[in-house]
């Protein structure tokens, strides 16, 4: 074993987050680490990499017992971490990012050997199949290319154990394929990977073993070839979840929202579709297809350059989000932490912000009404909090997303737009969010769901609009849905608009 962690325990302020957890890595394997948010995955890896000291237990790396006190100690033993939020300095060049802290200099003068650094950087990146100029500004590259730069940086420190945290969360399908090719190529050279992800399909196609944690406890380690999706889900949540998606028994009614020939220069062109009350209308497409731009324009985040929007067959103009809100449209954005929540505010305050009329008496906010709204919405959506004053930033990803959805339900929306509703959310919370969406649709809410996960699009949608390069290629009925059909149109198949 290249890594052995035995009986690891860790507490913070009396709260035990790891309880006698064991974890092993075989040389040259890709080992998935899974568990719901809050299961202890990140804490365990932070102990391995020297960010946190362990309270109890033993860590052995390459046969020797270690007690790292700093990430640099782990780096010396060949351990590197590639975080979900990449450590790229966008204004520096590609080479400067690769050599940061280890620059080639002329003696002790501090002058950089820029040419030598650039040549070596391009050589290292070429070995990963990435052809970029080392002098290019790193921030101008796609997230997928930035991720390969992070891998190259790890290899330049002679890392042979690489920990990857949600590496594909912001990548296109093509970038994911490239990343997997690189990972498999490095595996053949003996590099070992810990792969942390909620995406079950990726784990089953890439990894050899999987370790599951639950509530800070070690649950099981399985050989991928000898287990199943359902078994892993049960290990993660401690119960049978049933089907991944709710039974599809929705009965759409009258047209609630009509989008007619809407365009925005350089983003999308002549997009037309209708959404009925009581349906979940999916919008699929590859990254850059214009999906988020369309729904943000419907909500008034972006100004339309042409086209019309109708609510209940009446034309409306949204110059800003408040106009959309006043017309009964709610929006759960792709980035919940910057656009959906005020993370330093309490859960109760976040719920009150969009429901000021409900929680006010005259011109003053009523603490009693705020508490009543908090209790109603938290119960309705099953938000797990320590209390109304818990900061939103300390919630798990799934509970943060439930708060973002909950804050809109007080206004009883006619239309609910969800952009990547389960991104970064564990499998148990996904199931709960799907159930919430289904119940809202049954109550007559017209739901628009943008998602990059094709199983989610197919499992949840009544109909699906597929976009490619700013154009709506096709609206598919539920009985037409398949991954192959969606990808056909998402990659430009039949390059003309279908309705």
Curated annotation (Swiss-Prot):
Cross-referenced SMART domains: AAA
Residues where ATP binds: 35-42
Positions of the ABC transporter domain: 3-240, 250-494
Pfam families given in the database record: ABC_tran (PF00005)
Topology within the bilayer: Peripheral membrane protein
Function noted in UniProt: Part of the ABC transporter complex RbsABC involved in ribose import. Responsible for energy coupling to the transport system.
Keywords, ordered alphabetically: ATP-binding, Cell membrane, Membrane, Nucleotide-binding, Repeat, Sugar transport, Translocase, Transport
Cellular component, GO annotation: plasma membrane
Cited PANTHER family: CARBOHYDRATE TRANSPORT ATP-BINDING PROTEIN MG119-RELATED (PTHR43790), D-ALLOSE IMPORT ATP-BINDING PROTEIN ALSA-RELATED (PTHR43790:SF3)
Signal peptide: none
Species whose genome carries this gene: Shouchella clausii (strain KSM-K16)
Entry keyword Glycosyltransferase: no
Subunit: The complex is composed of an ATP-binding protein (RbsA), two transmembrane proteins (RbsC) and a solute-binding protein (RbsB).
The protein's Enzyme Commission number: 7.5.2.7
A GO term for molecular function: ABC-type D-ribose transporter activity
Protein family (similarity comment): Belongs to the ABC transporter superfamily. Ribose importer (TC 3.A.1.2.1) family.
InterPro entries xrefs: AAA+_ATPase, ABC_carbohydrate_import_ATPase, ABC_transporter-like_ATP-bd, ABC_transporter-like_CS, P-loop_NTPase
Protein's name in the database: Ribose import ATP-binding protein RbsA
Catalytic activity: D-ribose(out) + ATP + H2O = D-ribose(in) + ADP + phosphate + H(+)
Subcellular location: Cell membrane
The UniProt record lists the keyword Signal: no
């Amino acid at each position: 074993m290249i890594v052995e962690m035995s009986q690891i325990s860790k507490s913070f302020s009396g709260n035990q987050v790891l309880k006698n957890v064991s974890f092993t890595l075989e040389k040259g394997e890709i080992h998935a680490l899974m568990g719901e948010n809050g299961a202890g995955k990140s804490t365990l890896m932070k102990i391995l990499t020297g960010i946190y000291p362990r309270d109890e237990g033993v860590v052995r790396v390459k046969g020797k017992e270690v007690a790292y006190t700093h990430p640099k100690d782990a780096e010396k033993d060949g351990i590197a971490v590639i975080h979900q939020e990449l450590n790229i300095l966008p204004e520096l060049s590609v080479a400067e990012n690769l050599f940061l802290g280890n620059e080639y200099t002329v003696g002790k003068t501090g002058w950089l050997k820029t040419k030598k650094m650039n040549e070596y950087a391009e050589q290292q990146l070429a070995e990963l199949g990435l052809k970029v100029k080392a002098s290019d500004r790193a921030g101008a590259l796609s997230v997928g290319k930035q991720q390969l730069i992070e891998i190259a940086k790890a290899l330049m420190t002679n890392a042979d154990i690489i920990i990857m945290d949600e590496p594909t969360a912001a990548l296109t399908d093509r970038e994911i394929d490239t990343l997997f090719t690189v990972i498999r190529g490095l595996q053949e050279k003996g590099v070992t990977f810990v792969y942390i992800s909620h995406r079950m399909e990726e784990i089953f196609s890439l990894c050899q073993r999987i370790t599951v944690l639950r509530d800070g406890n070690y649950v099981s380690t399985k050989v991928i070839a000898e287990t199943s999706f359902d078994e892993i889900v049960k290990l993660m949540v401690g119960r049978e979840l049933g089907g991944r998606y709710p039974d599809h028994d929705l009965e759409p009614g009258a047209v609630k929202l009509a989008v007619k020939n809407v365009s925005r220069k350089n983003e999308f062109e002549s997009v037309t579709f209708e959404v009925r009350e009581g349906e979940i209308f999916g919008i699929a497409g590859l990254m850059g297809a214009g999906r988020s731009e369309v729904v943000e324009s419907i909500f008034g985040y972006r100004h339309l350059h042409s086209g019309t929007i109708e609510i209940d067959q009446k034309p409306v103009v949204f110059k800003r989000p408040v106009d959309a809100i006043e017309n009964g449209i709610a929006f759960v954005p792709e980035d919940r932490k910057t656009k959906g929540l005020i993370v330093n505010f309490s859960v109760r305050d976040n719920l009150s912000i969009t429901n000021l009329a409900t929680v006010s008496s005259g011109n003053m906010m009523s603490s009693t009404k705020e508490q009543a709204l908090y209790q109603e919405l938290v119960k309705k959506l099953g938000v797990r909090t320590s209390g109304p004053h818990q900061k939103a930033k300390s919630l798990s990803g799934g509970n943060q997303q439930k708060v973002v959805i909950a804050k809109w339900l007080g206004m009883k929306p006619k239309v609910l737009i969800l952009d990547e509703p389960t991104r970064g959310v564990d499998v148990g919370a996904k199931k709960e969010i799907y159930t919430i969406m289904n119940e809202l649709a049954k109550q007559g809410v017209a739901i628009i769901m943008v998602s990059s996960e094709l199983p989610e699009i197919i499992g949840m949608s009544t109909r699906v609009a597929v976009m490619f390069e700013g154009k709506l290629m096709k609206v598919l009925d539920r009985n037409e849905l398949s991954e192959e059909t969606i990808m056909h149109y998402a990659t430009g198949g039949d390059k003309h608009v279908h309705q």
